[in-house]
Amino acid sequence: MDPALRASFLQQLQQVYTAMDAAYGQAAAAYGFACNGCEESCCHTRFHHHTLIEYLGLREGFNQLPADRQAEIRERSAAVAEQHAQDLATGADSKPMCPLNSAGRCGLYARRPMICRLHGIPHELHPPQRPPQLGPGCGEFHRRCGRTNYHAFDRTPLYGELARLEAECRQALGRRRKIRMTVAEMLLTDEVGE
């Protein structure tokens, strides 16, 4: 991909992420919810990410890390990917820690994918031609704020912006193949091909 075009897409992705962070922050503040000190860390959840643009953004951040830090994260990513494979084979759910997490902090916090930014708070989606979908929020949210009245957190415009950017990026790259990768897989895959 042309470096200027890539930079433009990644800059637009950061703008979408800024909007996500602001919307999440506003919803969290309405509840008085702070996402920290959690026993049920979402960093132990096996999220699958589906966008090429987020893969490119995560890899861009990863590639800017010092070589020794990259090697450390790759090693943890391989262990997590292996554990996920074992879990799939056995039906277990061991919940290994995200390979980017170090001492409770994300090593690529500014580049973390959408679901890492928006997880935890009750939300709604309004898909076209279908009834609204409501998401309940995480267990920790319900322990702390479960009796609080619902505050609208509509993810629809945020997903729409990410989908628009994804479509433009895929068109520019001529990529059609769907992506379904964990963070560990994204960090172990140097190039997502056709």
List the predicted regions and their residue ranges.
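Short loop/turn segments that flank or connect secondary-structure elements
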Residues: 1-41, 45-194
